[in-house]
Amino acid sequence: MGYLVGVTALWAFSFSLIGVYLAGQVDSYFAVLVRVTLAMLVFLPFLRPSLLRGKQRLALMALGAIQLGIMYTFFYHSFLLLSVPEVLLFTIFTPVYIALLDDLMFKRFTPIYLVTAILAVLGAGVIRYDGIDSGFWLGFLVVQGANLCFAIGQVGYRRLAADLPPTLAWHNVFGWFFIGAMLVALPAFLLFGNSAALPSTTLQWGVLAWLGLVASGVGYFAWNQGATKVDAGTLAIMNNALVPAGLVVNLVIWNRDADVGKLLLGAAIMGAS
């Protein structure tokens, strides 16, 4: 639990740092590439390939590709379509995806999640009822893509950890996770990146360094370790604890002119889901 609480406090600043200093200024594919590269470099010196079998290494790489590589691609693009508070609020549905994946894994169906989806859309509409356009709904869907990838990564990591020895030194194998993410981030930048929109200030490079080395490197290792030490219910709660933490940071420091009333009303409807 302590891992999850600590990472929640750490990640509460990430949304605003991306939205304020990087979105629309630094190419999103490049930002993802730098972030993943720095995180990978944190763990490469500790990597011991002999600790995992081939299929286990591939599984950890696949989880990194989904939970980090693909998720970040969705996540960074969402800031081009939505405000920071909106991105934060729309991440509230990750626990729903975790539950749905759990249902799928155990061949169950829980109808209440259909009601949850309807309430989610209503809550989103309240937040932007006076300015809804195709870009807004696209942004909403992009965030859901990120949420789904993050959920798949967490569920998959828990399953993988359950099949590995409890004494495994995870810091000696976690580099595979970031290598998998790199296999998505590098081709994405080479194919779609804009080399004319690289960081132009020391502040932007500093933000990328912090996000890569600390928020991604330390953060994802600690979060995934924490996910293996709690039950699914606690993990779901902690997924949503990031929402109020990130909102407080954004509204207090960077976004004091936001329409707090609409945000609270929309959040209440989504919270009811």
Residue ranges, per PLM feature:
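Transmembrane alpha-helical segments that form core, pore/gating elements
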Residues: 19, 40-43, 98-99, 132-193
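Loop-to-transmembrane-helix transition segments
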Residues: 1-7, 48-75, 138-146, 198-218, ...
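Specific transmembrane alpha-helical segments of multi-pass solute transporters/efflux pumps
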Residues: 10, 14-15, 44-86, 91, ...
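Specific alpha-helical transmembrane segments that line the substrate/conduction pathway
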Residues: 30-40, 76-108, 114, 146, ...
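Membrane-interface helix-cap regions at the ends of transmembrane helices
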Residues: 13, 17-20, 38-54, 121-135, ...
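Helix-helix packing/entry segments at the starts of transmembrane helices
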Residues: 33, 87-93, 157-182, 213-252
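Hydrophobic transmembrane alpha-helices of multi-pass small-molecule transport proteins
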Residues: 43, 93, 109-129, 240-241, ...
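Hydrophobic/aromatic residues within transmembrane alpha-helices
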Residues: 21, 31, 78, 104-109, ...
